[in-house]
Amino acid sequence: MKLRISLLSLTFAMAVFSTVTAHASGCSNSTIRGSYAFTIHGTIFLPDGSTLLVDGIAKETFDGEGNVTQVDAVATNGNLTPGWRPGTGTYSLNADCTGTQTISVLGMPDLHLQIIVAQSGNTIHQVVIDPGLATTAEGERVKASKD
């Protein structure tokens, strides 16, 4: 009987600890506070059936409250406009570290992304979900914000 009670107590303790650990490792908007360097690759599918290859880099800074600013340099078919193109946006992270993001760049339609945060907030994977775009980006933290 004592063995059965001990095993039941141990099982209960492990279940409680597992729940606390799972909760502690969850994500929120504050998980990705700071700056990240991204590499961007993909394809734009034009209405006439032709395609444009996309390659670039971006620096995105997340404020931990759902807002993001960014600059990027993106080439299409090997043509890059000199300088950094600024943008702003919003993001929302779920407890399971999946989320959504919207980026607005002057003179362009908004981009809508699905995101996954990994490695305790040190890595972000993005995919653009707008029709006609097959573009992904991988980002790694370059500077954490303590504010």
What are these regions (language model features)?
Residues 1-10:
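Bacterial N-terminal signal peptides that target proteins for export
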Residues 9-18:
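Bacterial N-terminal signal peptides
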Residues 22-147:
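Mature soluble binding/inhibitory domains
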